[in-house]
Amino acid sequence: MKSAKLIVMYPVPTDLETFERRYAEEHVPMAVEKLAGKTRFVASLIKSNADQSAAQFHRIAEVYFPSISDVQACLSSPGGQETAAHAVEISSGGTPTFLISEVETFDF
């Protein structure tokens, strides 16, 4: 069985300072505590598009799980719903995009 991840892409916030404070102080601890079944959490701060132009996203969070069914179970749980609602609440640049993906890993 392939592993899976939840990807949350946050648009550039209208209030950068408030978003970053709430993301670090509230959201990340909430995700760590309440997202049942996760195996890894990766938070990326987007600097630019590859061509150095301004990116449409400010942060991308990736939360890894053993399977897609584990992602779905987490999102259906009270902790998953609370964490997703909080992501929407703090995202002052618009609603974040939530994606579920199957993970394939290639080692070199």
Task: Show which residues each predicted segment covers.
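Macromolecular interaction modules
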Residues: 1-108
